[in-house]
Amino acid sequence: MKNVLSIQSHVIYGHAGNSAAVFPMQRLGVNVWPLNTVQLSNHMQYGHWAGSAIDAAKMEQLVDGIAAIGALKRCDAVLSGFLGSPAQARAAVEIVRTVKATNPNAWYFCDPAMGQTGGIRPEPGVEEFIVAELPELADGMAPNHSELQKLAGQRIETVAEAVAACRSIIRRGPQVILVKHLHDRNSPADRFNMLVVTETEAWIGQRPLYAFPRHPVGVGDLTSAIFVARRLRGDSVRAAFEHTLAAVHAVVKATYDARRYELELVAAQDEIARPSEWFGAWVTGAD
Protein backbone atom coordinates (compact mmCIF):
# COMPACT_ATOMS: atom_id res chain seq x y z
CA MET A 1 0.00 0.00 0.00
CA LYS A 2 1.27 3.47 -0.91
CA ASN A 3 2.08 6.08 1.73
CA VAL A 4 1.81 9.86 1.44
CA LEU A 5 3.06 12.50 3.87
CA SER A 6 0.44 15.27 3.80
CA ILE A 7 1.69 18.66 5.06
CA GLN A 8 -1.34 20.93 5.40
CA SER A 9 -3.54 22.88 7.78
CA HIS A 10 -6.09 21.07 9.96
CA VAL A 11 -9.45 21.94 11.48
CA ILE A 12 -11.06 19.95 14.28
CA TYR A 13 -14.60 20.80 13.18
CA GLY A 14 -15.38 20.62 9.50
CA HIS A 15 -13.25 19.92 6.46
CA ALA A 16 -10.31 21.99 5.25
CA GLY A 17 -6.67 21.17 4.64
CA ASN A 18 -5.82 17.73 6.01
CA SER A 19 -9.36 17.49 7.38
CA ALA A 20 -10.55 17.49 3.76
CA ALA A 21 -7.67 15.44 2.34
CA VAL A 22 -6.85 12.58 4.70
CA PHE A 23 -10.09 10.60 4.70
CA PRO A 24 -10.61 10.71 0.90
CA MET A 25 -7.07 9.45 0.30
CA GLN A 26 -7.58 6.68 2.85
CA ARG A 27 -10.91 5.79 1.23
CA LEU A 28 -9.04 5.44 -2.05
CA GLY A 29 -6.62 2.96 -0.51
CA VAL A 30 -3.64 5.15 0.38
CA ASN A 31 -2.02 5.40 3.82
CA VAL A 32 -1.76 9.03 4.94
CA TRP A 33 0.73 10.51 7.37
CA PRO A 34 -0.76 13.91 8.28
CA LEU A 35 1.56 16.69 9.41
CA ASN A 36 -0.58 19.66 10.41
CA THR A 37 0.96 23.08 9.78
CA VAL A 38 -1.92 24.80 11.58
CA GLN A 39 -4.38 23.38 14.11
CA LEU A 40 -7.66 25.31 14.34
CA SER A 41 -11.02 24.70 15.95
CA ASN A 42 -12.73 25.41 12.61
CA HIS A 43 -12.03 27.34 9.44
CA MET A 44 -11.98 31.09 9.85
CA GLN A 45 -14.92 31.92 7.61
CA TYR A 46 -17.18 31.18 10.56
CA GLY A 47 -15.94 34.44 12.06
CA HIS A 48 -14.69 32.84 15.28
CA TRP A 49 -11.87 30.36 15.68
CA ALA A 50 -9.17 29.19 18.06
CA GLY A 51 -5.84 27.57 17.39
CA SER A 52 -2.27 28.15 16.31
CA ALA A 53 0.48 27.21 13.86
CA ILE A 54 3.14 24.61 14.54
CA ASP A 55 6.70 25.83 14.89
CA ALA A 56 8.63 25.24 11.65
CA ALA A 57 11.49 23.50 13.46
CA LYS A 58 9.03 21.01 14.94
CA MET A 59 7.85 20.08 11.44
CA GLU A 60 11.33 18.84 10.59
CA GLN A 61 11.73 17.19 14.00
CA LEU A 62 8.55 15.18 13.47
CA VAL A 63 9.77 13.88 10.13
CA ASP A 64 13.19 13.14 11.63
CA GLY A 65 11.31 11.03 14.17
CA ILE A 66 9.77 8.98 11.38
CA ALA A 67 13.22 8.54 9.85
CA ALA A 68 14.64 7.43 13.20
CA ILE A 69 12.35 4.40 13.30
CA GLY A 70 13.22 3.47 9.72
CA ALA A 71 9.79 4.25 8.28
CA LEU A 72 10.56 7.27 6.10
CA LYS A 73 11.90 5.06 3.31
CA ARG A 74 8.32 3.83 2.85
CA CYS A 75 7.06 7.33 2.01
CA ASP A 76 6.01 7.31 -1.65
CA ALA A 77 4.91 10.94 -1.97
CA VAL A 78 4.70 14.26 -0.19
CA LEU A 79 1.65 16.48 -0.62
CA SER A 80 1.91 20.03 0.66
CA GLY A 81 -0.90 22.54 1.06
CA PHE A 82 -1.19 25.57 3.32
CA LEU A 83 2.17 26.82 4.60
CA GLY A 84 1.62 29.70 6.97
CA SER A 85 5.03 31.35 7.06
CA PRO A 86 8.28 31.49 5.08
CA ALA A 87 9.84 29.39 7.84
CA GLN A 88 7.19 26.68 7.36
CA ALA A 89 7.73 26.81 3.60
CA ARG A 90 11.47 26.36 4.04
CA ALA A 91 10.83 23.48 6.45
CA ALA A 92 8.57 21.82 3.88
CA VAL A 93 11.34 22.08 1.28
CA GLU A 94 13.82 20.44 3.64
CA ILE A 95 11.31 17.70 4.43
CA VAL A 96 10.78 16.98 0.73
CA ARG A 97 14.54 16.82 0.18
CA THR A 98 14.90 14.45 3.13
CA VAL A 99 12.15 12.17 1.83
CA LYS A 100 13.63 12.11 -1.67
CA ALA A 101 17.10 11.40 -0.31
CA THR A 102 15.67 8.49 1.67
CA ASN A 103 13.48 7.20 -1.17
CA PRO A 104 14.64 8.46 -4.59
CA ASN A 105 11.40 7.18 -6.14
CA ALA A 106 9.23 9.41 -3.93
CA TRP A 107 7.58 12.38 -5.60
CA TYR A 108 6.37 15.76 -4.43
CA PHE A 109 2.99 17.27 -5.27
CA CYS A 110 2.58 20.92 -4.32
CA ASP A 111 -0.81 22.58 -3.81
CA PRO A 112 0.51 26.17 -3.82
CA ALA A 113 -1.85 27.84 -1.37
CA MET A 114 -1.05 31.52 -1.87
CA GLY A 115 -4.34 33.21 -1.12
CA GLN A 116 -6.84 32.98 1.69
CA THR A 117 -7.40 29.33 2.60
CA GLY A 118 -10.37 28.67 4.87
CA GLY A 119 -10.05 32.25 6.03
CA ILE A 120 -6.33 31.83 6.78
CA ARG A 121 -3.91 34.06 4.92
CA PRO A 122 -0.20 33.17 4.77
CA GLU A 123 2.35 35.57 6.20
CA PRO A 124 4.14 37.98 3.85
CA GLY A 125 6.90 36.24 1.94
CA VAL A 126 5.17 32.87 1.49
CA GLU A 127 3.80 33.70 -1.95
CA GLU A 128 7.18 34.90 -3.18
CA PHE A 129 8.89 31.79 -1.80
CA ILE A 130 6.41 29.45 -3.47
CA VAL A 131 6.75 31.16 -6.85
CA ALA A 132 10.55 31.31 -6.71
CA GLU A 133 11.42 27.97 -5.13
CA LEU A 134 8.76 25.27 -5.36
CA PRO A 135 8.35 24.69 -9.13
CA GLU A 136 11.96 23.47 -9.34
CA LEU A 137 11.36 20.98 -6.53
CA ALA A 138 7.85 19.77 -7.33
CA ASP A 139 6.99 16.80 -9.54
CA GLY A 140 3.43 18.11 -9.80
CA MET A 141 1.51 21.24 -8.82
CA ALA A 142 -2.18 22.04 -8.33
CA PRO A 143 -2.84 25.78 -8.53
CA ASN A 144 -6.23 27.40 -8.84
CA HIS A 145 -6.71 30.13 -11.44
CA SER A 146 -5.21 32.99 -9.45
CA GLU A 147 -2.31 30.85 -8.24
CA LEU A 148 -1.58 29.79 -11.82
CA GLN A 149 -1.40 33.44 -12.84
CA LYS A 150 1.05 34.16 -10.02
CA LEU A 151 3.23 31.15 -10.82
CA ALA A 152 3.33 32.00 -14.53
CA GLY A 153 3.51 35.76 -14.07
CA GLN A 154 0.75 36.46 -16.57
CA ARG A 155 -2.95 37.16 -16.84
CA ILE A 156 -5.04 34.20 -18.03
CA GLU A 157 -8.48 34.45 -19.64
CA THR A 158 -8.68 31.44 -21.98
CA VAL A 159 -7.85 27.75 -22.06
CA ALA A 160 -5.07 28.38 -24.56
CA GLU A 161 -3.47 30.92 -22.26
CA ALA A 162 -3.81 28.52 -19.32
CA VAL A 163 -2.13 25.69 -21.21
CA ALA A 164 0.72 27.99 -22.22
CA ALA A 165 1.08 29.14 -18.61
CA CYS A 166 1.20 25.55 -17.37
CA ARG A 167 3.85 24.68 -19.93
CA SER A 168 5.98 27.61 -18.80
CA ILE A 169 5.87 26.20 -15.26
CA ILE A 170 6.56 22.66 -16.47
CA ARG A 171 9.76 23.91 -18.08
CA ARG A 172 10.92 24.81 -14.57
CA GLY A 173 10.49 21.29 -13.21
CA PRO A 174 7.02 19.77 -12.63
CA GLN A 175 5.83 16.98 -14.88
CA VAL A 176 2.13 17.76 -14.46
CA ILE A 177 0.02 20.79 -13.57
CA LEU A 178 -3.53 20.27 -12.31
CA VAL A 179 -5.55 23.50 -12.48
CA LYS A 180 -8.21 22.95 -9.83
CA HIS A 181 -10.48 25.76 -11.06
CA LEU A 182 -10.02 27.54 -14.37
CA HIS A 183 -11.91 30.68 -15.32
CA ASP A 184 -12.41 30.69 -19.09
CA ARG A 185 -14.21 33.63 -20.66
CA ASN A 186 -15.56 31.32 -23.38
CA SER A 187 -17.17 28.78 -21.03
CA PRO A 188 -20.83 28.77 -19.91
CA ALA A 189 -21.38 30.52 -16.58
CA ASP A 190 -22.94 27.41 -15.03
CA ARG A 191 -19.91 25.16 -15.62
CA PHE A 192 -16.88 24.56 -13.41
CA ASN A 193 -13.69 24.05 -15.45
CA MET A 194 -10.65 21.98 -14.54
CA LEU A 195 -7.50 21.47 -16.58
CA VAL A 196 -4.52 19.12 -16.45
CA VAL A 197 -1.38 19.67 -18.49
CA THR A 198 1.81 17.71 -19.12
CA GLU A 199 4.73 18.54 -21.39
CA THR A 200 3.00 17.02 -24.42
CA GLU A 201 -0.71 16.69 -23.57
CA ALA A 202 -3.54 18.70 -22.04
CA TRP A 203 -7.08 17.76 -21.05
CA ILE A 204 -9.97 19.93 -19.92
CA GLY A 205 -13.05 18.80 -18.03
CA GLN A 206 -16.25 20.45 -16.86
CA ARG A 207 -18.76 19.73 -14.13
CA PRO A 208 -21.87 21.61 -13.00
CA LEU A 209 -21.34 24.73 -10.90
CA TYR A 210 -23.71 24.88 -7.92
CA ALA A 211 -25.08 28.17 -6.57
CA PHE A 212 -24.30 27.76 -2.87
CA PRO A 213 -25.49 30.55 -0.56
CA ARG A 214 -22.10 30.06 1.15
CA HIS A 215 -19.50 28.07 -0.76
CA PRO A 216 -17.97 25.23 1.27
CA VAL A 217 -14.30 25.41 2.16
CA GLY A 218 -11.87 22.61 1.33
CA VAL A 219 -12.88 21.74 -2.23
CA GLY A 220 -9.40 22.51 -3.54
CA ASP A 221 -7.78 20.42 -0.81
CA LEU A 222 -10.12 17.56 -1.68
CA THR A 223 -9.29 17.91 -5.37
CA SER A 224 -5.52 17.68 -4.87
CA ALA A 225 -5.91 14.75 -2.49
CA ILE A 226 -8.00 12.64 -4.85
CA PHE A 227 -5.68 13.31 -7.78
CA VAL A 228 -2.61 12.35 -5.73
CA ALA A 229 -4.27 9.19 -4.42
CA ARG A 230 -5.34 8.04 -7.87
CA ARG A 231 -1.85 8.68 -9.27
CA LEU A 232 -0.34 6.71 -6.39
CA ARG A 233 -2.73 3.87 -7.20
CA GLY A 234 -1.33 3.76 -10.73
CA ASP A 235 -3.80 5.82 -12.76
CA SER A 236 -2.59 7.68 -15.83
CA VAL A 237 -2.76 11.46 -15.66
CA ARG A 238 -5.99 11.48 -17.66
CA ALA A 239 -7.62 8.69 -15.64
CA ALA A 240 -6.70 10.37 -12.35
CA PHE A 241 -8.04 13.67 -13.67
CA GLU A 242 -11.38 12.18 -14.73
CA HIS A 243 -11.78 10.35 -11.41
CA THR A 244 -10.99 13.57 -9.54
CA LEU A 245 -13.48 15.57 -11.59
CA ALA A 246 -16.24 13.02 -10.96
CA ALA A 247 -15.52 12.37 -7.28
CA VAL A 248 -15.26 16.04 -6.34
CA HIS A 249 -18.50 16.73 -8.18
CA ALA A 250 -20.20 13.96 -6.21
CA VAL A 251 -19.07 15.44 -2.89
CA VAL A 252 -20.06 18.97 -3.92
CA LYS A 253 -23.46 17.79 -5.15
CA ALA A 254 -24.10 15.83 -1.94
CA THR A 255 -23.18 18.92 0.06
CA TYR A 256 -25.45 21.14 -2.02
CA ASP A 257 -28.37 18.69 -1.89
CA ALA A 258 -28.02 18.40 1.90
CA ARG A 259 -27.89 22.20 2.22
CA ARG A 260 -24.69 21.94 4.22
CA TYR A 261 -21.80 24.35 4.59
CA GLU A 262 -19.21 21.67 5.37
CA LEU A 263 -18.32 19.08 2.73
CA GLU A 264 -20.29 15.83 3.01
CA LEU A 265 -17.21 13.63 2.81
CA VAL A 266 -18.49 10.73 4.90
CA ALA A 267 -21.93 10.67 3.31
CA ALA A 268 -20.37 10.68 -0.16
CA GLN A 269 -17.49 8.32 0.59
CA ASP A 270 -18.66 5.59 -1.79
CA GLU A 271 -18.86 8.19 -4.55
CA ILE A 272 -15.28 9.21 -3.80
CA ALA A 273 -14.18 5.62 -4.40
CA ARG A 274 -16.57 4.83 -7.27
CA PRO A 275 -18.25 7.91 -8.76
CA SER A 276 -21.62 7.16 -10.33
CA GLU A 277 -21.58 10.14 -12.69
CA TRP A 278 -18.60 10.79 -14.94
CA PHE A 279 -17.53 13.83 -16.93
CA GLY A 280 -15.14 12.85 -19.67
CA ALA A 281 -12.08 14.98 -20.26
CA TRP A 282 -11.21 16.05 -23.76
CA VAL A 283 -7.91 16.97 -25.31
CA THR A 284 -7.50 20.68 -25.84
CA GLY A 285 -6.09 21.90 -29.13
CA ALA A 286 -4.34 24.79 -27.43
CA ASP A 287 -0.62 25.05 -28.09
UniProtKB/Swiss-Prot annotation:
Entry keywords, A to Z: ATP-binding, Kinase, Magnesium, Nucleotide-binding, Transferase
Positions that bind ATP: 111, 142, 147, 180
GO cellular component: cytosol
GO biological process, one term: pyridoxal 5'-phosphate salvage
SUPFAM superfamilies: Ribokinase-like
Domain of life where this protein originates: Bacteria
Annotated pathway: Cofactor metabolism; pyridoxal 5'-phosphate salvage; pyridoxal 5'-phosphate from pyridoxal: step 1/1
Catalytic activity: pyridoxal + ATP = pyridoxal 5'-phosphate + ADP + H(+)
Co-factor requirement: Mg(2+)
EC number per UniProt: 2.7.1.35
UniProt-annotated binding residues for substrate: 9, 44-45, 221
Gene3D superfamilies reported in the protein's UniProt record: 3.40.1190.20
Described purpose of this protein according to its UniProt entry: Pyridoxal kinase involved in the salvage pathway of pyridoxal 5'-phosphate (PLP). Catalyzes the phosphorylation of pyridoxal to PLP.
Family: Belongs to the pyridoxine kinase family. PdxY subfamily.
PANTHER family cross-referenced by the UniProt entry: PYRIDOXAL KINASE
NCBIfam families named among the record's database cross-references: PRK05756.1, pyridox_kin
Subunit note: Homodimer.
Name of the protein: Pyridoxal kinase PdxY
Organism: Burkholderia pseudomallei (strain K96243)
Taxonomic classification: Bacteria, Pseudomonadati, Pseudomonadota, Betaproteobacteria, Burkholderiales
Record gene name: pdxY
